A protein has these predicted regions:
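N-terminal metal-binding scaffold of metallo-dependent hydrolase/deaminase domains
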Residues: 1-49
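Divalent metal-coordination and catalytic microenvironments
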Residues: 9, 27, 33, 64, ...
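C-terminal cap of metal-dependent C-N hydrolases
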Residues: 15, 383-433
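Alpha-helical scaffold segments that flank or form the walls of functional sites
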Residues: 66, 84-155, 179-193
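Active-site gating loops and adjacent loop-to-helix segments of metal-dependent hydrolytic enzymes
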Residues: 82-113, 161-176, 235-264, 289, ...
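Metal-coordinating catalytic core of metallo-dependent amide/deamination hydrolases
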Residues: 141-273
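His/Asp/Glu-enriched, well-ordered alpha-helical/loop segment
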Residues: 258-264, 308-393
Length: 433
């Protein structure tokens, strides 16, 4: 890959409390796909990138367009795309039994799975999501195909073959040995630690995993030093159920921790709507990341996650669409919904300020991106995951660059995203079929 310099209006967040803004700025990207430097003019870029040889790089001028970090979806169920926007009048547990599990059972058919996965990934591409933390299904072959499709597309993903062996339909229930064997196959095939697409250990949630399966998942994560994803404290009835199933655990989070699934390797837990007390302290101590899924939490009547409080406590946070509990794959909408949830919290407790735009943008980009490594910023050494936004149709002339970005986040859509990059490579439109 040839080293390049991109010229545009560049905006990103090194820190959560402010934007870095370079009007008509330049960002240099090395042949390894990483940012070498960012500056307001070429002379400053030359000083900053003394070893880069600016003169030999191709300069790509995006004119009056915005250049921002790409989006990261930190919690999404790819096999639920067919149910997107359906059964939104149910709470979590009946929604799982009546809609989600029957749909996921269809993924035993790899042809059906590929058709749905292509549709899912194309939508992600449209909305500028270049990295994802993804639930597959229990089916090894279908999960393998999903990982292959991400590789073919040039989009980054941590993809999990789901582990579950209780409180689920027979078609989705597999014994411990089969669950581990399927994961071992995928680890062998996609185990490159520097690969864009890698496995992530994925016990669905405590109610669907016996202690034996949870223990095996923890051992697998430790053996291969793989990340872990699951769900935590999403719904009050779910929390009560976990307390019945795991009476020796001090909290829902402790139920994972006892089996080596709560920060012993990099861990992300979706929702955490009701996380508090000892569970919160354990999460902070172990460095567990929260995937905040505002649309899903509203749709399934789960509650409002206290993201301002978690942020102030130093908890790592990213945003997730949680399709199909959530109804929208546009991650820019998640920024808006997360701010709105924060404002609802503010109405209940004026001691906590609601989230502002720089904070939520930082959460969605640099904070979320840290789960993949150095992703989500244009600081030197970061992988160049980026979007080019042509907001001319939104009449930008009267606005500052920050207001242009804010306006795009609130009222723009995929039609304004004209270029997408992942690890320095431009990502072409993936085939639907």
């Amino acid at each position: 890959m040839m080293k390049k310099i991109y010229k545009a209006h560049i905006l990103f967040t090194k820190e959560k409390d402010r934007f870095e803004v370079y009007e008509n700025g330049y960002v240099a990207v090395g042949d390894d796909g990483r940012v070498v430097g960012v500056a307001s003019n070429l002379d400053d870029l030359k000083v900053q990138c003394s070893k880069f040889n600016v003169q030999s790089a191709e300069i790509v001028d995006f004119g009056d367009k915005l250049l921002i970090p790409a989006m990261n979806d930190m919690h999404v169920h790819a096999p639920q795309v067919h149910n997107q926007g359906v059964a939104m009048d149910l709470e979590l547990l009946p929604w799982l039994q009546n809609y989600t599990f029957p749909e996921e059972s269809k993924y035993a058919d790899v042809e059906y799975a590929e058709r749905m996965y292509r549709r899912f990934m194309h939508t992600q591409w449209l909305f500028g999501t270049m990295r994802s933390v993804v639930f597959g299904t229990v089916h090894t072959a279908s999960t393998r195909r999903l990982m292959q499709l991400y590789q073919e597309a040039g989009m980054g993903a941590l993809v999990g073959k789901v582990a579950m062996n209780r409180n689920c339909p027979e078609a989705l229930c597999e014994d411990v040995e089969a669950a581990i064997e399927g994961n071992e196959q995928l680890i062998a095939e996609f185990g490159d630690r520097d690969g864009l697409v890698r496995p992530i250990i994925t016990p669905r949630f405590v109610p669907s995993c016996t202690p034996e399966l949870l223990k095996a998942c923890g051992e697998l994560a430790n053996k291969y030093q793989l990340p872990v994803q699951s769900h935590l404290s999403e719904n009050v009835s779910e929390i009560a159920w976990v307390a019945e199933l795991e009476p020796e655990s001090k909290s829902y989070g402790d139920a994972y921790n006892r089996y080596g699934l709560f920060g012993q390797t990099p861990t992300i837990m979706a929702h955490c709507v009701w996380t508090q007390g000892a569970e919160l302290e354990l999460m902070k101590r172990n460095g567990v990341m929260v995937a905040h899924c505002p649309t899903s939490n509203f749709n399934l009547s789960s509650g409002m996650a206290p993201i301002r409080s978690l942020l102030d406590e130093g908890v790592r946070i990213g945003l997730g669409s949680d399709i199909s509990g959530g109804h929208d794959l546009n991650m820019f909408r998640m920024l808006v919904y997360a701010i709105q949830v924060s404002k609802m919290h503010y109405q209940l407790n004026h001691d906590k300020a609601f989230l502002n735009l720089s904070e939520i943008f930082w959460i969605a980009t640099k904070s979320a991106g840290s789960f993949f490594g150095k992703v989500g910023s244009f600081e030197p050494g970061y992988e160049f995951d980026a979007l080019v936004i042509d907001d001319a149709v939104l009449y930008p002339a009267e606005y500052s660059l920050l207001h242009r970005l804010e306006r795009f986040i609130y009222v723009g859509d995929d039609r304004q995203i004209v270029h997408r990059f992942c690890r320095g490579q431009e990502v072409p439109e993936p085939k639907v079929f």
